[in-house]
């Protein structure tokens, strides 16, 4: 088990050496069922998760309680509401498992203690935060610049295995369309290249 965990951690491009060491030394293995809330909006993030197996989504709820997924995370991804964890402010996001997950978990106190005691930890967490910011800017820009059909096609090309694991109603919300509209997009794409884009 430890060798598999080490391999998974070493594959992480965005998790630095210090965080890898902390996940190995201080992290705990936790198994979580599908559709379980890891972080509720309005709460301070208490845990940093490394996904060993499974899938997690980050979502936001509007005033009426309807949720929209803003990002998906899969094996070897590290996830939390980083801004909440570091600032101590309540998160505006929810973190929910989409599949049963095996997670490696670091608690906030350990991360913050190491943040203060390890000389390179602040710069490494800053680099991680900057990377996440770039990802969010790209997501935002693509959401504005591309149609839902174009975004779906891009996901089909770049992440077909991951795309197949996302429930269609969640994917529809992520793309900003209804499940019926997503069904039409998928049907049109299957029917051939001469089809009209939405």
Regions found by a protein language model. Give the residues of each.
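Localized chelating/binding microdomains
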Residues: 10-20, 48-51, 61, 102, ...
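Cyclic nucleotide-binding regulatory domains
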Residues: 37-98
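Short, basic/aromatic recognition patches
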Residues: 30-37
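Cyclic nucleotide-binding regulatory module and flanking cytosolic helices
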Residues: 1-29, 84
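A small-molecule sensor/coupling module
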Residues: 91, 110-147, 151
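Residues that recognize and position ribonucleotide moieties
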Residues: 30, 49, 71, 96, ...
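Phosphate-/nucleic-acid-contacting segments
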Residues: 146-198
């Amino acid at each position: 088990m430890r060798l598999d965990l080490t391999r998974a951690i070493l594959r992480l491009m965005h998790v630095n050496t210090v965080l890898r060491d902390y996940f190995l030394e201080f992290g705990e293995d936790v198994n979580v069922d599908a559709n379980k809330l890891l972080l509720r909006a309005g709460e301070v993030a208490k845990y940093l998760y490394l996904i060993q197996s499974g899938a997690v989504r980050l979502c936001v709820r509007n005033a009426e309680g309807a949720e929209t997924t803003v990002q998906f995370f899969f094996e070897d991804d590290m996830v939390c509401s980083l801004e909440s964890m570091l600032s101590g402010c309540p998160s505006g996001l929810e973190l929910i498992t989409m599949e049963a997950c095996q997670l490696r978990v670091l608690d906030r106190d350990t991360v913050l203690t190491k943040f203060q005691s390890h000389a390179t930890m602040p710069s490494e967490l800053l680099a991680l935060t900057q990377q996440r910011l770039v990802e969010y800017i790209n997501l935002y820009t693509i959401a504005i610049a591309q149609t839902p059909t174009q975004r779906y096609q891009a996901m089909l090309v770049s992440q077909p295995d991951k795309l197949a694991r996302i429930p269609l109603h969640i994917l529809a919300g992520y793309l900003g369309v209804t499940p019926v509209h997503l069904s039409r997009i998928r049907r049109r794409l299957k029917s051939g290249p001469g089809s009209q884009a939405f």
